[in-house]
Amino acid sequence: MSNGDVVVDADQQQAQAVVAPQQLELQIKLPSFIDQKGDLKIPSHYEETITDLKLTLTVIPKTRSLTNYLILIQGEHDVEQFGEIVTFGQIIEELALGEPECLQIQIREKPYNLAAVYEQIIRLREIVGLHYVDKVSQELGSCGGVTRFNSIKLDPVTARGEAEKSDTNEEEQEQGKGKVGKPNEKESGETKETDSQPELSREELLQLSDLVKEIEESPESINFTQATKFDNINGKVKIPLKSFAVSQWSPVPSFQKTKGDLLYLTVQTLENETFHITSHFTGFFVNKCSATTFNPALKTNEKGRYHKHYLLYELLAQLSPSFTKTIEDNEVKLSESTEHPETYLLPNNSFLAFPWVVNASDLKNIPDSSRSQLMLISNGVDGSEIIKEWNNDIQAMKELPSTNFQERLMRDKLIQKTLFDFSKTATETAINIIKGNIAPMNPGEEPDKLIYLKNGVFYSAGTSTVDVFDKTGGEEASRYVSSKDLAAIKIVNRHELKGISTLVTCIVDYMGKRIVCQAPVPGILDAAPPSEEEDDAGAEQEKKEEGKAEEDEEEEIMEKVLYGLSSDSQKILEDKSFEKPLKLLSEVFHLKPHGVKLSEQVKSEGDLVVSKDTKGLKGTDGRKYAIDLYRTTPRDIEFIEAHFKEGENDSYPHGEALIRHEAVNEWWKRKVSALFAAETEKLEKEGKLEKDGSKGTNSEEKSQIALPIDQVSFNPDAFSSDFESKEDRDEVREISKFIKEKLIPEFIEECQHQLAPFDGQQLSEQLHRYGINLRYLGYIAEQVLVKKAEYEESVEKTIKENEELVKVREAEKVEKDRREAEEAEKAKERAAAQPESSSDDKNQETIENSDAKSKENTESDDKDAEEQPVSKATYELVLANYDSLYRLAIQEMVARASKHVLRQIMKETPLELSAKAVAHFHNCLLGGEINTSPEAEIDPLEASFFSQSAISFAKLTHKDVVAQVAKEVGSRFRFTLEENWIEKLVHLPQLFREIALKFGIQWKSFDYTFTKQEFEHSQREQKQESVVDNVEKKHSKKSKKKSPALPIENKPTSFARSSIFIADDIVGFVPLVKDSSYKPTLVDEIFANARSQLLSGDKDLGMAMLAELVTIYEAIYGKVNSQTAKFYSLVAKVYQELGFDKEAAIMGRKAVVLSERSCGFDNHDTIAAYMNSAYFELANSQIANSLKLYLRAMQLWTSTYGKDHPALVNLLTNVADSLYYAKDYESALKLFNAALEACSHLNGQASEIAGLFHFKIANVLVSQQKIEKSKDSFVAANEIFQKLLGPDDSMTDQTSKYISNVAMYIEYLKARQAQSKKSPPPTQTVAPNARVSASQASAKVANGNGTGSSKSKKGKKDKSTPQSDPQIANQSVEDILKFIEGKSKPNAKSKSKHTKA
């Protein structure tokens, strides 16, 4: 883009328009039946649309039941003539109204038709809460969108911390320290760097102590029952009607249609009264019908009174006194249950996350007669609205104007909503296809080749193209490339290429079967469209073709492909009209134009701009479509040649292994960067590139470097035939080598410095971001062990070198001491001639000598402090991160292999026995210690319906399944599991979870046990519970009073088990959906502009843009969406960085709730959101809230990984630091010791971070006045630093001085104590002043794993660790610390930088 500057300016103007629209007040006159005064004022602006107004009316209580109305501008202009997406500014301009600040709008009711009645019914169901009930039956699984956030019981977010910090800042400014920013920053909500925490009350300290105890005693393994105690906010909502449905008298008979009747309804109120209602074009009224008599006329009583209203809601409010009151009570209950509406809001364009383990008590069904009628009232008067031309709709939306912000926003919003609607419709149909509820179009074919057409969508098995890959893996290859095709479609959609379209696509995996869902190319079932070249051909060509054989004509009619390899693979088609649009696609994927030759008969005449397997088709809508985009990345030829051996047992499953787009893009960037560097160097040598605009060159005329980036491309068809150039093959081989030679080593190296993943899904996402395919997991696991061994060797080498260096330094010290001893001896001889002093004088002399020595060292220590080099310590949990990465890699390989084994089992198993097969598989895999030959639960009657081969899964044993999984790991990941790997290498509870998530299984919440000891203990408890239950039942029968009905809980504990799982433990299966939705570029552009404004110093505009961007995210994605959740978390981080701690804390809480509901209650994004939220609460000085959130995060990663995750060290350190600053030293000491223990267990005892914890513990002990005990910790820290950092490192030097000063202080105390026995204590204590800063050591806290660090002030070395100053006996702790640190004045306290997740 040569005109880059103009584009940037346009974007900035657009962003400016986002945050500064012209304001407009809407003065709305309502119909008289709503409000006699009829006035409603709504603030708006010129950029809002009629759609925005309608959405606003749906949330205002007074107008929310309105559905069928006209909107008149200035009392006469109907907005329907303008359209709903037109802005008020455009309407005002069209009507030539000038620039009014107020716009007169009138709402006028319209006569109902049947479609409008359906809309009114749907709105009523939403208002009364029936749509929450619908969710249960319409969901693709059970308990979607659960959350546990409200159970934490956080204190409200307050701004208390800001005031406290501000006061501390003023004190620091008086001392000339800790000054950051301008004094008036407090007014803008910014906070300054400080560590001061509010003084805590006794009650707060007790609360913190209890939370610390919870953290210490947190269980090591997952408790499934506790983990599924979800919030039940919606369960508190009461439906204000007992029954509401379309009446049995519907549809309206012909003789009543002429009277205006549209539909008949039946309602039963909470007062147990039943009313029959007529839906009339004038409104709704109670009629004279009964269950047996049809009379739809208006019902009047003897006084002539009747019930009629234009709005159904208002009519029901007249009929039932409890109706409105119940709705109001529901709203109160919801608001009191949680301060976060995100907890119960329903998504409008995304799926909720379904938990893999479900509390059985949450599995409820609520009666609702109208629920089964939703298909009737939701899809138009004849049900035809469910059938859509999906491709045509999406392409039409993409072609909408996008010249300004509002147009782009509306366009992106419509596209995202339609893509979700497609995915939802396709997923529901795919499930019905798998269950056999829909007939195929080709019933005679094999099951894997069946295709379906339903509701405008084509469905096929993921293996339907198996014939195309018969030599490269067949079914496995076909299944694999379908996902690669979808990945390419998402990229094309995001780039919004003009002139070429892709198919709306999603992939559904359900119960081990895959269905590919695609909206067909318009007209694909019609006769083949002529290409543009054929259109230009004359009549003479047509006459020549008349002589062709009839079969050739039929073949031409069937051929739909106009570009690429023909359907029968017999020729290469090259419609020139496709070249230009496909050229855009090739630029996105860096494809090289190339000739194709498969044989002498099948070859291209010119160069194809895309792969031969990418086909160009033309729809009857006139658009050009590109399909089969899986070949937009090259083959991973190095991997294929090494591991795919067709026909061999140990071969990789298929030969279609492709490189990820991320890897290709990274390779391309580095190649272009190398070209740029080479070209720059060349021009500089030739003198053609002037540096810094020398010779008076104008900035606009600076030299530009033209790079031949089109040469950095590859042939996607390389290695597909024998007729290819060596250059093309070499380029593809280079990209293939790039993964193992560059990307994987860089990934492993980076793992040293960052927090380890929490589960296999996060590991997979990280690998994908790096461009690494999961088939390299085995290689990564092997390399991790190699890198770990190398690191350990380097540490051992470092220790040996430092030990030798220590000996040298000790020898130097001995020599120095010898010389000093000689000097002392001479001084002693000179002093011998003087009179002998008393013991009191000697003690005083000791003190004075100590003072003198300390004073003598002060100047040199001050100088040393100024010139102190930065320590080379990194405090990274390298070994712990390597171990975690290795463990997760093994677990992910085993989980994925288990999924494939289970998929093969399910392929032969009838759907009716799926739960039994899955439970048996899990017993065989995970229950080997309990029962090596578990029995499958198959009822003889059920078995009689199927063949023996269909129930062959029952013959599986523990040994069989473990061997199959190990074989899959070997073939798919090229990794050999060691013997007894199931006991040694994987953690069974976490593997259980991973398989459930990957296969889409929902289990009942139950304390599943995986060891023989735990299982037997569980069985004994079950027997005891059974005895208690029987006693209670007998007692209840004798009771005169009836106990209230309890919800049915399908308890799997009612009988003794012989294995871990039973079929009844499985609640159900959920589909795993991959869709073609994408992130619009609009939000990225605005966010980039907002960050730019913030960095440039315009914080008001930047913050306003961020706030508006939150609204944009909610408009495009909906409030309940994973993308919205991630953006909330991002905005919270920005707020915190700017010092808006309160706002960050509020936004962080919202991010947690949305992550739980849209990502999963124990998803890694949710864990990160909890940790970030804890950090934001801590920054806002709400320590108790922070501890509660950290505790929940730890409980979550215990279920996904185990408590011993490296993040445990991070959490314990952050919490301990917080308690230390709050002066709760006892709790801080407990957690620092726990952090040291965890660090020693995970990362070894001799590590830099272990030394740091010893140092922190010593500081706490000093704060507690346990001086002698602190010396041991200082010594331990010093020994570690000497070994790992060397004797010359600043940390080693400082800890050595600490040890010396502590020893000196102990000597000082002893001398003072001896003197105090002889004489009264002095009125003033003069402390030694050897200046050694304790905080210089702790300032360099781990920057890798978030173990806490201190912020440096504008690049200067931070020399201040917070110390306490409670008053004690004759001295304060501050005096003690000043002595230990050697300072005459306390340093400014620095803020602990707790690492965010």
From Swiss-Prot:
InterPro entries: CLU-central (IPR033646), CLU_dom (IPR025697), CLU_N (IPR028275), CLU_prot (IPR027523), GSKIP_dom_sf (IPR023231), TPR-like_helical_dom_sf (IPR011990)
Superkingdom classification of source: Eukaryota
Regions of compositional bias (Polar residues) in chain numbering: 1314-1338, 1362-1373
Stored CDD domains: CLU-central (cd15466)
TPR repeats: 30-63, 559-595, 1167-1200, 1209-1242
Annotated compartments: Cytoplasm
Family: Belongs to the CLU family.
Protein name: Clustered mitochondria protein homolog
Gene symbol of the encoding locus: CLU1
